[in-house]
Amino acid sequence: MTTKFQIFSGLPSAPLQPSSSLLKKPLATTLFGTRPVDTLKFRVMRIAKPVRGGGAIGVRMNLFDRFARVVKSYANALVSTFEDPEKILEQAVLEMNDDLTKMRQATAQVLASQKRLENKYKAAQQASEEWYRKAQLALQKGEEDLAREALKRRKSFADNASSLKAQLDQQKSVVDNLVSNTRLLESKIQEARSKKDTLKARAQSAKTATKVSEMLGNVNTSSALSAFEKMEEKVMTMESQAEALGQLTTDDLEGKFAMLETSSVDDDLANLKKELAGSSKKGELPPGRSSTTSTTSTKTGNPFRDADIEIELEQLRKRSKEL
C-alpha cells in the first residue's frame, strides 16, 4: 500500500523533519472502520505566514510623511502671504553686509597671522646667517668645536626658517582666496543693492496698480454713468425750455412791430387809392397828408410813420397829379 501511494504521489517514505522546521509530521490514519489497513503517510508542508508588522510600520511612515508634507505646504503658503518684497530685500542686503563684515574680519586676522609669520621667518633667516658668520669666525680662529656648535645652531634656525616659509606660502594662498572672495562678495552686494532699488520700485508700482484696480473695482461705474446721463438729459431739457421761451418772447415783440407797420402801410395804400379814384382835388394833398401834417408828424416823431415810405408816397402823388 505504501509502495502504491509512493508511486502515485511521488513522495518518499523517508522520516520527516521535526515540527520546528517548515514540515509537519506525517499523519497515520486507519480507514474503513476497525479493519486494519496499512497506514497512509502524507507529507504536509507548513506554509509560513508573512509577517505583517513591517507593512503596518511602512503604512504609518507613509501617512506621517504625507501629513508632514501637507503641514509644510500650508506653512509655506502662510509665510508667503506675510512676506513683503521690500522688507525681504532689505533683510537680504543686511545679511550680505554682515557676511562681508565677517569676511573682512577673517581676512584681517589672517593678514595679521601672515605678518607674524613673515617676522618670524625673517628673524630665523637672520639668526641662521648670524650663526653661519660666527662659525666662519670661529673656524678662522682655529676653534673647530666652537665652529661646529655654531653650525648646529645655524642648522636649527635654517630648519625653522624653512618650516616658517612653508607656512607662510600656505598662509598667502589663504589670504589671496579670502581677498578674492571678499571682492566678489562686494560686487555681489553692489549688484544686489541696484537690483533692490529696481525691485522696490517695481513692487511699489505693483502695489499702487493693485490699489487703483481695487478702487476701480469697488466703484459702481454703471450707476455713475447713468447719473451723468440723467443730468445731461436734464440740462438739455432746461436749454430747450429756455430757447423756446426766448423764441416766444421774440416772436411776440416782432409781431407787435409788424402789426404797427402793416397798419401804417394799409392807411397809405387807402389814401393812394382815393387819390387815384379822383376823390381828392387836383393839386391838393390827400386828407391827413398835408405838408404841415407831415412836418408835424415828422417833428413829433410819430413812430408809426417811416420817412422813406413818406418820400416814396410823395413821389407817387406827384406822378398821379401829372397824369
Swiss-Prot record:
Localization annotation: Plastid, Chloroplast inner membrane; Plastid, Chloroplast outer membrane; Plastid, Chloroplast thylakoid membrane
Family indicated by similarity: Belongs to the PspA/Vipp/IM30 family.
Annotated membrane topology: Peripheral membrane protein
Highest taxon in the source lineage: Eukaryota
Subunit structure: Homomultimer. Complex formation involves interaction via the central alpha-helical domain (71-286).
Coiled-coil annotated residue ranges, if any: 95-247
Functional summary from the UniProt entry: Required for plastid vesicle formation and thylakoid membrane biogenesis, but not for functional assembly of thylakoid protein complexes.
Gene Ontology CC terms, in alphabetical order: chloroplast inner membrane; chloroplast outer membrane; chloroplast thylakoid membrane
GO BP field: thylakoid membrane organization
Name used for this protein in its record: Membrane-associated protein VIPP1, chloroplastic
Low complexity composition bias: residue spans: 290-300
Disordered: annotated segments: 276-308
Keywords of the record: Chloroplast, Coiled coil, Membrane, Plastid, Plastid inner membrane, Plastid outer membrane, Thylakoid, Transit peptide
PANTHER family: MEMBRANE-ASSOCIATED PROTEIN VIPP1, CHLOROPLASTIC
One Pfam short name: PspA_IM30
Signal peptide: none
UniProt KW Thylakoid keyword: yes
Transit peptide: 1-44
